[in-house]
């Protein structure tokens, strides 16, 4: 089975100046590609060239670094525009194409040119703040309703499914969340009395709210529990 995964944004940036990293092998989407690979699929990842790592790496899958255009108009950290995605999708004879987010210029191109074997994996559960939220409301209110009629949309959470169902009719009842690489995170039956949060330590993540909630848990239920922030 030939699978194309379109995910231009490989990791989070706070502004349009994309920071270079040494490797992409610690990203969620790379682990997803490996999971398909282990199932015997022929996997291709299409990503923005701005996210190409600074170090030369070898991969057990195909990676296409798409040229990112019009970066002054379309911020590459939130709305990258990679027009060659259409050519890649149509010329690769793929059995399945997975793209991230309805609010995406690249997803729109795919929804219009290869809708039959396309899955749009929707994470956002509320309007994006790009251009003060006006762009998001226009996109979902008009573009999503007309441009994504034939593509199947699969949400990553209940919140995102409820949100996208307001604008698109072809939303799957099945929710598929982010996976976990069990080679890095080994499941076990024995549990310790502790909680773990994986988050960036930046203001918009509001990690203090999680700490406050944990403090309430300690006071009300169990003051011996531990919290790890990673």
Where are these predicted regions, by residue range?
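N-terminal subdomain of nucleotide-sugar transferases
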Residues: 1-51, 92
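Active-site proximal beta-strand in glycosyltransferases
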Residues: 3-6, 96-98, 111-129, 153-154
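Conserved donor-binding/catalytic core segment of Leloir-type glycosyltransferases
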Residues: 4-6, 154, 188-216, 227-228
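Acceptor-binding helix/loop patch of EC 2.4 sugar-transfer enzymes
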Residues: 12-16, 68, 119-146
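Membrane-proximal helix-turn-helix segments that form the acceptor-binding/catalytic region
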Residues: 30-32, 134-154, 162, 167
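Conserved nucleotide-sugar phosphate-binding/catalytic loop shared by glycosyltransferases and other
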Residues: 51-76
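An amphipathic, basic-hydrophobic alpha-helix
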Residues: 67-99, 104-108, 112, 137-145
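Carbohydrate-associated surface elements
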Residues: 159, 179, 191
